[in-house]
Amino acid sequence: MTEVTKNDFTEEGKIVRKIRSFVRREGRLTKGQEGAIQECWPSMGIDFVEQMLDWNEVFGNNNPVVLEIGFGMGASLVEMAKNAPEKNFLGIEVHRPGVGACLAAAKEAGVTNLRVMCHDAVEVFESMIPDSSVNTLQLFFPDPWHKARHHKRRIVKAEFAEMIRPKLIQGGIFHMATDWENYSEHMIEVMNAAPGYENIATDGDFIPRPDERPLTKFEARGHRLGHGVWDIKFRRNA
C-alpha cells in the first residue's frame, strides 16, 4: 500500500498549494485494521498510479461501477456491495484506519465486488478514472466546513462538478447526502449552475433517502433527535 502526493508547479518551479477538502488525521490503526490491510490489500486494494484503470482488469467483469468518495469506516459501503453483487464498488478514503475497518468488514461479509484506495480522490479522478465509465458517484456526509471562511474547502464546488462529469456515463448519477442544511443548499446551487447536469427530484430540490443508501447508526440517532438529512441526485445529461 503506497501513498503518493502529486504537486503542481509554477513556471518558476514553485509548488502550487492545493486547497484540500479534508484534513489528514492519521489516527492509530487497531491490530484488526492493520491486519486487514496486510491481508486484504493485495486482493482488494488499489495503489495510486498515474495510469487509467481498466475496470475489467480490476473486477474481472464489466458490471456497472459505483464509486464512493470518503467512505469513513466503510460499513455502509460494504453493506451496499453485499446487497448489490451485480455491481462493482470502488471506495476512496484518505484515512488509513477507515480503510482498515472497511477491509475487515468486507472480509467478514465475504464481498468480492469491492475495491478500495487510500488517496486524495481528486487526484485519483484526474489520473486513474476513465471517461464515461462510472455509473454512480456517491458522496455521503462530506465535511461541511460550516464556518464561512472555510467554505472554499468544501469538495462540492464548480471545479469539482466539472471534473467528475466526463467520468460519469451518459445518464450517470451523482448522489450526495448531508446532514447540514446549509451545505445541502450549497450543493444544489453549485450543481444547478454546473453545465451538463439535471436534478432528478420532481421539485428540483431533494429526494427521499433511497433504499440503496443504508441508514447509518449516526443518521438513525440524528433522526431520533429531530435532525434532518438531505439526499440529492443529479444526472449527467450532456
From Swiss-Prot:
PROSITE patterns: SAM_MT_TRMB. Its EC number is 2.1.1.33. Signal peptide: none annotated. It catalyses: guanosine(46) in tRNA + S-adenosyl-L-methionine = N(7)-methylguanosine(46) in tRNA + S-adenosyl-L-homocysteine. Pathway: tRNA modification; N(7)-methylguanine-tRNA biosynthesis. The active site is at 143. Keywords: Methyltransferase, S-adenosyl-L-methionine, Transferase, tRNA processing. It is an enzyme of class 2 (transferase). SUPFAM superfamilies: S-adenosyl-L-methionine-dependent methyltransferases. GO terms for cellular component: tRNA methyltransferase complex. This is tRNA (guanine-N(7)-)-methyltransferase. InterPro entries: SAM-dependent_MTases_sf, tRNA_(Gua-N-7)_MeTrfase_Trmb, tRNA_methyltr_TrmB_bact. Catalyzes the formation of N(7)-methylguanine at position 46 (m7G46) in tRNA.
